[in-house]
Regions:
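Short, low-complexity, polybasic intrinsically disordered segments
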Residues: 214-235
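Conserved active-site loop/cleft motifs that coordinate metal ions or position small ligands
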Residues: 201-204, 235-240
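A short, acidic, flexible beta-alpha connecting loop/helix-capping segment that sits on the rim
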Residues: 241-245
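Chitinase-like catalytic core of GlcNAc-active glycosidases
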Residues: 1-191, 195-201, 205-221, 247-273
Length: 276
């Protein structure tokens, strides 16, 4: 746990299918009621933070790909939310899952059912982005949610891993991506400029990214924070809490690690930079 910066919410990533049926599991492996996971969630809540259950991610099978009906899918999502004691649900949809129109539609139907039963449920979508904005598949997902009367509180864009041709400043890319996505959200949801900013969140991959030549620095984090405050966005976040520390050998790295940033820093420095 990283208490630096006093985060208001932790995204718990990820709940996915166990691979073949409609059973939600942490990382596709651990039962949603796993005692060790429950203990960690309790510790996060005791710090004063809320928790948001994030479904999907880059690996494994998202539940909409393995559940046979909207009602069963809604039940699976609800079970995971109940296990975590959460009223915040995020759907991190990327890769092949984003292009699967059948699962996109089923997910929208299930979320709508879930919101009918849970009036306090706040829903966000986490989607990949480029400096030019959201791609056609992401727009189609948001339109599906709209068509099924899903109340979308926030669209969280992943300002990271743009590709080998993007070798410029990562802070600048984050801002450019946000500006483009803002205009798209205003169009899809019929929002005012202010409303579109309030419905947008930014998540950056701190330190060394998965793509060569992409490194998000502490200065970039401060730049994103300042921009977010100016525009009034919903939140800024990072991938991930476990990475917000210097690697053991203290040196910079050319490869992204799961447990450290790959840049020189003090523990929790990125959280503090985002918090201001």
């Amino acid at each position: 746990m990283d208490p630096a910066g006093s985060p208001s919410t932790y995204n718990l990533a990820f709940v996915i299918s166990d691979g073949s049926d409609c059973t939600p599991k942490w990382n596709g492996t651990y039962a949603i009621g796993n005692s060790a996971v429950a203990s960690r969630i309790s510790a996060l809540k005791e710090s004063g933070a809320s928790v948001r259950v994030s479904f999907g991610g880059a690996s494994g099978k998202e539940l909409a790909e393995t559940c046979s009906s909207a009602s069963k899918l809604a039940e699976a999502y609800g079970a995971a939310l109940d296990a975590a004691g959460a009223t915040l649900a995020d759907f991190d949809i990327e890769g092949d899952t984003l292009t699967d129109s059948a699962s996109v539609e089923l997910r929208s139907q299930a979320i709508a059912l879930l919101q009918k039963d849970r009036s306090d449920l706040s829903v966000s979508f986490t989607l990949p982005v480029m400096p030019a904005g959201l791609d056609d598949d992401s727009i189609a997902l948001l339109e599906s949610a709209n068509d099924n009367s899903v109340q979308v509180a926030t669209v969280n864009i992943m300002t990271m891993n743009y590709g080998s041709s993007y070798d410029g400043d990562m802070g600048d890319y984050a801002l450019t991506s946000a500006e483009a996505a803002h205009d798209q959200l205003a169009d899809v949801f019929g929002l005012s400029s202010k409303g579109a900013w309030q419905g947008l969140a930014l998540t950056s991959m701190i330190g060394v990214n998965d793509v060569d030549n992409e490194t998000f620095t502490l200065a970039d984090a401060a730049q994103v924070r300042s921009f977010a405050e100016e525009k009034g966005v919903a939140w800024v976040s990072m991938w991930s809490t476990f990475r917000d520390q210097q690697c053991d050998d203290g040196s910079k790295s050319n490869d992204a690690a799961t447990d450290c940033s790959g840049v020189k820093q003090t523990s929790g420095a990125f959280a503090e930079a985002f918090a201001g």
